[in-house]
Amino acid sequence: MIKWPWKAQEITQNEDWPWDNALAIPLLVNLTAQEQARLIALAERFLQQKRLVALQGFELDSLKSARIALIFCLPILELGIEWLDGFHEVLIYPAPFVVDDEWEDDIGLVHSQRVVQSGQSWQQGPIILNWLDIQDSFDASGFNLIIHEVAHKLDMRNGDRASGIPFIPLRDVAGWEHDLHAAMNNIQDEIDLVGESAASIDAYAATDPAECFAVLSEYFFSAPELFAPRFPALWQRFCQFYRQDPSQRLRVSAAEGDYGEESEH
C-alpha cells in the first residue's frame, strides 16, 4: 500500500481547448486528419469525465491538459472511451515523487520503504503521473509514461491484477502469452550481452509480463520501428488488440514526405 501526500489543485473545466497546438508533438504527427479529429473528440470526453489534479505546486493550463488528454486517448482511439472507465482521477506531480511503499512478502512479513516513483496505477484507483516524464512522452522515442500507465489499466480490465494479457479472445491467450514471454527472453538476452543502459528496448520490459506489455505498448505507439521488425508476431497481436498499426502510419508519412520533396524539385 502506498501512502500519498494529498496537497492538490484541481483544474477547472475549459471548453476552449487549444487542440491544434496540443496535436503539434512528434508522437501525434503521423495521425491522419480523420484520426486527429476522432482523437480530439475522445480527448474532449476524457476531460469531461476525468479530474486532472495538480499536486505539490504544479500548475496545469489548457495546453498541458489537452496534450495529456490526447495521449491518454491515443491507445483507445479504436477501442472507445469506455476502455478508460477504470479510473476517475489523474494526479500529477511536478517531478518524480517519493512515497511510502508497504508490501507483504511470501511469508507474511510487512516491509516498508520510501521509494521514488515516476507513475502509478492500480485497479479502480487513480493514475499517478509526473510532469517531467509527461513532457518526455511527447517525443517519438519509445518512452511514454502516460501510455505505460494506460496499458496497465487496459491490462487490468481482464482481471484484478495486471498480467500482461489484456482483454482478448480466449482463443488468442495462449499465443499472446507465448509471444510475450519470447519477447521478454529476447530482451533479457540482449541485456545480458550489452547491459541495461545499452539495450535497444527498456530493460524494465524483462522484469515481468505486465511490465513487458506496458513497455512494449510505449514502443508500439512511439517507436514502432524498434518493435515491429524485432517481434513481428507479437507486433501483429498488438495491432489486433489496439486495432491500430503505427508502423503503417510511419510508412505512409515517410512516403508522403518523400513525395513532397520530389514535387519541390
Curated annotation (Swiss-Prot):
Its cofactor is Zn(2+). Its EC number is 3.4.11.-. InterPro entries: MetalloPept_cat_dom_sf, MtfA_enterob, MtfA_fam, MtfA_N. GO terms for molecular function: aminopeptidase activity; metallopeptidase activity; zinc ion binding. It is an enzyme of class 3 (hydrolase). Zn(2+) binds at H111, H148, H152, E211. CDD domains: Peptidase_M90_mtfA. It is found in: Cytoplasm. The keyword Metal-binding applies. Disulfide bonds: none annotated. Binds 1 zinc ion per subunit. Interacts with Mlc. Involved in the modulation of the activity of the glucose-phosphotransferase system (glucose-PTS). Interacts with the transcriptional repressor Mlc, preventing its interaction with DNA and leading to the modulation of expression of genes regulated by Mlc, including ptsG, which encodes the PTS system glucose-specific EIICB component. Shows zinc-dependent metallopeptidase activity. Belongs to the MtfA family. This is Mlc titration factor A. It comes from Salmonella choleraesuis (strain SC-B67).
